[in-house]
Amino acid sequence: MLALTLSSCSAGGGLEAAQAGSAGTQEFVSGDLRVHEIPPAERREPVRFAGVTERGDAVSSDDFVDQVLVVNFWYAACGPCIVEAPLLEEVWQTHQGNDVAFLGVNIYDQPSTAESFAADNGVSYPSVIDIVDKSVSQAFAAVTPIQATPTTLVLDRQGRVAARIIGELQSASILSALVADALQETT
């Protein structure tokens, strides 16, 4: 496990609320970066989700069959989300066209705010707006713990969570290595 210093955000009623346990307990990460790769034999079932992007386009897990998918949970007022946005875009630009896709999951903002964030921070990949029923967040939370915002997941070509980064991404090379590992796996 790799540990680095960071800060993470918490939006009341956001993804963390979707993660709340039966006793109402919630898990948060603050003060460190956690990277966890999951060996193929230990991965859970593929994540099935469907939502609508900030531009009104329908998107679902079916759109990413046989691709490595990077999913980033974020919102516009989250300081670490702002800091890591250029790093995520750098990794996206590096791997774009190599059976890799990127998808944001905005857990708090209206579509216009998400579009402004993308324009202001140079983010070119789409984001699902998941503020109404939290169905996308809940689909992922059913398969893997999402304890803080931002959280970044790498899904293998089968749609299973292969790696999880909890907290602010500190270096593009961390995510790039996780994507490369997932790309090298045989299905």
Locations of regions flagged by a protein language model:
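N-terminal targeting signals for export/organelle localization
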Residues: 1-50, 187
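Short, ordered coil/turn segments that flank beta-strands lining enzyme active or ligand-binding pockets
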Residues: 7, 54-55, 157
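A short beta-strand-turn-helix
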Residues: 39-69
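Extracytoplasmic
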Residues: 44-46, 64-66, 97-100, 112, ...
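Short active-site neighborhood of thiol/selenol oxidoreductases, capturing the structured segment around
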Residues: 59-82, 88, 102
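Structural microenvironment flanking redox-active thiols in thiol-disulfide oxidoreductases
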Residues: 82-122, 133-139
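Thiol/disulfide oxidoreductase modules built on the thioredoxin-like
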Residues: 119-123, 131-184
